[in-house]
From Swiss-Prot:
GO cellular component: a single term: NatB complex
Name of the molecule in the record: N-alpha-acetyltransferase 20
E.C. number: 2.3.1.-
Molecular function terms, GO-annotated: protein-N-terminal amino-acid acetyltransferase activity
Biological role: Seems to be involved in N-acetylation.
Gene Ontology terms: biological process: N-terminal peptidyl-methionine acetylation; regulation of actin cytoskeleton organization
Organism, scientific name: Dictyostelium discoideum (Social amoeba)
Top EC class of this enzyme: transferase
Top-level taxon of the source organism: Eukaryota
UniProt keywords, alphabetically: Acyltransferase, Transferase
Domain N-acetyltransferase, first and last residues per copy: 2-151
Gene behind the chain: nat5
Amino acid sequence: MTTIRRFVCDDLFKFNNINLDYLTETYYLPFYLQYLSKWPSLLSMAEDVNGKPMGYMIGKAEGEGINWHGHVTAVSVAPEFRRIGLADRLMHILEEGSEKIYDGYFVDLFVRKSNTLAINMYTKFGYSVYRTVIGYYSGDEDALDMRKALPRDVEKKSIIPLKHPVYPTDADL
């Protein structure tokens, strides 16, 4: 059985088993605390019956006007808990918060262009590639900016793909 609850400060000292994955971006403690203070409803922790962390979601709300949206900063599931639908459940919670609490037009995320497993998973969740961001990750790896329109974007304008790649300095990141 899995419990998904709001992420709390103490979770920062419990989720190393999840962050050991080389594809998981990790951040400094103040970064996580900033998210907890500004967007607490967009951070979730999944744990098993014994309280062991299984996965987490960290997100935020950002942008202006029709670019107001929810952003997936990190979603990660421990290797032993993958392929049971946990990432889908965590993503759904963030999407729901982005829609109902923050009234966003879409949800976006960045994923390494080489991470085909994640790209396929996000596509299955209804996300599509909006643009390529050249050299976004360390080692000059490109990112795909993937988006999913929320009900507020009735005409789905937020997910019309750009025809050309952008650089991090050119993009509203």
